[in-house]
């Protein structure tokens, strides 16, 4: 599986020199290039990653977030999925997010109403703030099965060290004082 074709956190800095129309054009051309180049080898793609947070992401300025603010979440997803589907009509296309709140459900519903060709719902089950357990796992599956699409757990983290405290909202902001991974 290819992961991801579009993501605000790994966006090339040099894109910032362009206007939003040019940025989108370059993103879509890259999707077309990569999906075509790997057809037959990679036929399953996380098309766009973590869109729930994308237009409000303010940790740093980046081109993908800027375009998403312009197009809106569903508009951005529709553009990227259309490019991926045109490049390989037989590919399995996933929408992927770590956010399992009602916001993701609303986003998926909006995409399906806009005829975005989502084949699979991707759910990240990072457990940085605690073990999910069967109860939460079943709860998440129950909520997202209502869309009638297969569900893939696309990313999963089991923490072997300190859990991230509950008050930390942006998980990448948490730093442990030391890494107890070596005996010395």
Question: Could you tell me what each predicted segment is?
Answer:
Residues 21, 29, 33-43, 113-122, ...:
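Structural recognition of alpha->loop->beta junctions
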Residues 63-94, 102-180:
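Glycoside hydrolase catalytic-domain groove-lining segments
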